[in-house]
């Protein structure tokens, strides 16, 4: 019997953990789970040590007042791992919490194998993080195909297991066509997806510049229509901010709708759109999976931007550009993220989407599309690592 202690600290980690559990049960039916789980992992049969939401804090303003509670949860988790003495501890993303747990567990019981799921982006900045985690992490499960060499160079085993985006369902052509017809209402289009982010800070920074860019696009394309799927945490803020836009926008508000309906509508919007104006982040991979070309824009505090520019090791932040080894997705960051430049980039993309569509297809192939599901690949890697001990 294989005993696995899993730790997820946020919704994305819960999804990865649930898929990993499914894979482990398929490959090793006698597997037993314990740890910290969200609703998806609990649905796979795990009882959470405490609510995963206790760990879901972001930003200094949230962390400082909750630090004593987080510290208690940290030591409670370490004690639980040591008491259960699992064959393997799998920490999933959330490095600030998870890597502290792994470090303390390794110091107290070196016999417990440690696996971290989601490699830190050392290829982009702070490369020293790999060497710092190597003394207490035996194996890393990577989502991106170019990540293993960075982890292996620091002395850890690293397996590329595929990105979860390749396993996400996509809207059918009929669903996309129905959404497009309902949204455009007989106009010629184009249909433009506006994605200013999922967090209050980034939405507040990007909404005005994205709105001004849309004003310019609609002036050039009178039949254009903007659609904005609001993230669950910010629908009210989004509505307040877009009220001042120079053009109308259809805000897809998830409030009060069942989760499956929200997800289905979002998938239809992604596939139906001619182009997207998006904040930087993993949303670029969701757009690539839907086959929608994009322009990426992002603003942050001036000091943060200067620090990032000096520390960055790559010349692009867009994952489609990185995975496809192209630079076909336009990205306008910091002071370059201004309305006229965004509108011009959207125009160019609408006029010639072909290079982006080719890069998106290549990206999905390299991330594992049409291969073994990422959760099963991750499970196989974990079990293989145990077998090598």
Model-based region annotation:
Residues 1-389:
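Nucleotide-activated sugar donor-binding and catalytic core shared by glycosyltransferases
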């Amino acid at each position: 019997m294989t005993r696995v202690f899993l730790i997820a600290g946020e919704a994305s980690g819960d999804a990865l953990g649930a898929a990993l559990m499914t894979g482990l049960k398929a490959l090793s039916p006698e597997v037993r789970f314990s740890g910290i789980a969200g609703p998806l992992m609990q649905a796979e049969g795990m009882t959470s040590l405490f609510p995963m939401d206790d760990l879901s804090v972001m930003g200094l303003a949230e962390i400082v007042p909750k630090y004593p509670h987080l510290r208690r949860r940290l030591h409670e988790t370490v004690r639980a791992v040591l008491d259960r003495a699992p064959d393997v501890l799998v920490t999933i993303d959330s490095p600030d919490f998870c890597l502290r747990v792994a470090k303390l567990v390794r110091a107290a019981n070196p016999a417990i194998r440690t696996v971290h799921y989601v490699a830190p982006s050392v290829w982009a900045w702070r490369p020293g993080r790999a060497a710092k985690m190597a003394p207490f992490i035996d194996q890393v499960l990577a989502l991106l195909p170019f990540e293993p060499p960075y982890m292996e160079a620091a002395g850890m085993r690293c397996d590329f297991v595929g990105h979860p985006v390749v396993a996400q369902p996509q809207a059918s052509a009929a669903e996309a066509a129905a959404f497009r017809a309902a949204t455009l209402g007989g106009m010629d289009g184009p249909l433009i997806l506006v994605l200013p982010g999922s967090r209050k800070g980034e939405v507040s920074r990007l909404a005005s510049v994205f709105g001004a860019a849309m004003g310019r696009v609609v002036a050039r394309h009178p039949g254009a229509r903007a659609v904005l799927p609001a993230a669950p945490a910010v629908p009210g803020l989004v509505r307040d901010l877009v009220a001042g836009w120079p053009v109308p926008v259809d805000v897809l508000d998830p409030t009060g709708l069942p989760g499956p309906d929200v997800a289905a509508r979002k998938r239809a919007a992604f596939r139906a759109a001619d182009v997207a104006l998006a904040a930087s982040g993993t949303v670029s991979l969701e757009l690539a999976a839907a086959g929608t070309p994009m322009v990426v824009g992002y603003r942050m505090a001036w000091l943060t931007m200067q620090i990032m520019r000096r520390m960055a090791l790559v010349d692009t932040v867009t994952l489609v550009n990185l995975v496809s080894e192209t630079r076909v997705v336009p990205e306008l960051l910091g002071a370059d993220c201004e309305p006229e430049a965004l509108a011009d980039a959207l125009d160019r993309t609408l006029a010639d989407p072909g290079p982006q569509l080719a890069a998106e297809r290549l990206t999905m192939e390299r991330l594992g599309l049409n291969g073994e599901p990422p959760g099963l690949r991750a499970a196989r890697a974990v079990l293989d690592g145990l077998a090598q001990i």
